[in-house]
Amino acid sequence: MSLKKARTVAYACSYVPVEVIMAAGLTPERLIPQGRCSKAEGFVHPNTCFYVKSLLSDAMAGAFADMDAVILANSCDAMRRLYDLWGAYVKSPTALFMDIPKKKDQDSIGFFTAELGRISADLSMIPDGQRVTKERLETAIKQMNDLRNQCNDLFMIMRSKPGCLTGSECFALLQDGPDSDLRGFSQKATTILKRESMNTSTKNGPRIIITGNMVNKPDLISMIENAGGRVVGIDTCFGRKNYDLKVAEGMSDPLAAIAARYLLRPSCPRMIGIKDQIQDLTNQITDTKSDGVIVSKIKFCDNLSYNIPVFQEAVVAAGARCLVLENDYEWSDIEKVRIKVEAFIEMLG
């Protein structure tokens, strides 16, 4: 008897609540484009974010055709344009659009709650999709909160016992897509947590936080560690920001609880509130006792570009050093990056 393939709904931004996808009986999967963005060059402005161009290029090449739907959001103007282009030039999968507020006040939470209700109805119309109920939402919330607990335990081990869990190993776990395979990730995390209780090894070297845009390849972390550094924080939408803060359980309106969690979690530069973002980064430097912060900035990401000068000042004020690495998402200039990273680690050492 053949096994029926689980229906998959992809998403391109960590502000898309995976609990809603799970409650519809579907499997969430983060879109991580891998191809070069040359195929998309003729359809977008040259100064468009390389992550968005890579997404469009892979989609036009059919890399996501086996998925049942994709949720795109107004994370930034480039992502909004991606939704327009997707409808015109990508045959499959169908794209759903999610409007995400930029503020965190009660009006924004109320608006986002209504938006999640609309998306829930759209997801239930996908073949094999189920009606999103309170009970199904509560189950999904519990599952994701358990995942967040495990991820935060792993982050704690990474910063305190790198001999047990290095930054490269932690990144590899996150890259596997924990929310797409909850059981498999839980088994791997449990193995590491048991190993941690028996491992007392330590490793000296400059302590580094990686922040900024999404880092999709392990090369940056590997070169930091090969140069003698210790990655003690992966502070991106692929790392801590995506797993910090749990959804309140047992609430009368689970959708409102989900909306609040996603808007109130540690934010990326697309959100209003740079003072909160600076305070969060400063707290991370203090909590991890970091010596340096490496900011990964994808070319033409306007939101992060505006904030970087203020971030640099905040890092120095917190007693650390800052290195900004602009990249084309593919890290095609990786050897130039290696020279900068090695010099940075040497300076900190």
Predicted feature locations:
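Proline-aspartate-enriched helix->loop->beta-strand connector
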Residues: 285, 289-294
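Redox- and metal-dependent alpha/beta enzyme cores, enriched for Fe-S-associated oxidoreductases
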Residues: 12-33, 211-284
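Short, charged, surface-exposed secondary-structure boundary motifs
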Residues: 37-45, 104-109, 240-247, 333-335
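Peripheral docking tails and interdomain loops at the edges
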Residues: 308-349
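Acidic/His-rich segments in extracytoplasmic proteins that coordinate ligands and/or metal ions
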Residues: 54-125
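A charged, amphipathic alpha-helical module
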Residues: 2-8, 117, 121-245
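Metallocofactor- and cofactor-centric catalytic cores in central/energy metabolism, strongly enriched
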Residues: 2, 10-11, 38-41, 49-57
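Glycine-rich, highly charged phosphate/nucleotide-binding loops
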Residues: 44-61, 269-283
